Amino acid sequence: MLENECLEFAASSDEEVCGLIVGNESLVRCRNIHQDPRRHFRISDDDWLETEAAGEITAVFHSHPEQKLVLSGADRSGQLATGIDWWLASGGKLRKFRPVEHLLGRTFKHGVMDCYTLFRDAYHLCGIDLPDFERTNGWWLRGEDLYLKNMAANGFHGVNMQDVQLGDVFIRRAFPESDPCHAMIYLGDNTILHHENTGRLSRREPLRPAYLRLTHSIWRHEQCSSLDFRGVFDDISAKSL
């Protein structure tokens, strides 16, 4: 099995190992030519071109010898440069990451790059995969309650404001008369990550009193203990560099 081969390769070295996945069927092992192979990896141009000549490269594989099953900031920059999935092995586990856009600085497009896309992608980078769902513009005015229906159906439960913690999701109204329709991810220290349909880019900012007044509920995933928010913070640091 391909995943097992990747894990065995990762376990064979106390440095980062790397390779290329061809056609989602085979692993081509590559030499890590980075000057600091315990903390980083680099695949040579020759290895990449030789592998590409043999078949379609569908993913990049590498390992983290330390216990860190999320992509680093350098990994995220590298992934977006390749535009393909990256597979990561660490601690005897394998995780596959889609090449989602950096979390900060996104341009809003409803149903494609909106507040739920940001929420879903942030959780993906932290280790929890959420489904996408169809949504048409104006659903928050038609009583469809997409957030409230989908939060409960996908492992989230409500929590109180006094118990809020890193990774919780605030669901608020866009304005007092609308249904709850906007997600804000709590980053700790009274800071949120969100993407509004106001012509502004996705951003992190303080949790403002105005946002709290419009908040309908706060949600926490049943597997919140498995969330590794280093995946979000490393992506933010990579975008901020």
Regions found by a protein language model. Give the residues of each.
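Conserved beta-strand-loop surface patch within small alpha/beta domains used
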Residues: M1-I57, P65-R98
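Surface-exposed patches in mature extracellular/periplasmic domains of secreted proteins
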Residues: L130-R135
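Extended, compositionally biased flexible segments
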Residues: E56-P65, H195, R200-S202, P206-S217
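...with weaker cross-activation on analogous glycine-rich loops/strands in unrelated enzymes
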Residues: T136-S202, L207
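Active-site nucleophilic cysteine motif
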Residues: H110-C126
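Second-shell loop/turn segments in exported
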Residues: L104-K109
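Glycine- and charge-enriched low-complexity intrinsically disordered segments
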Residues: E205-L241
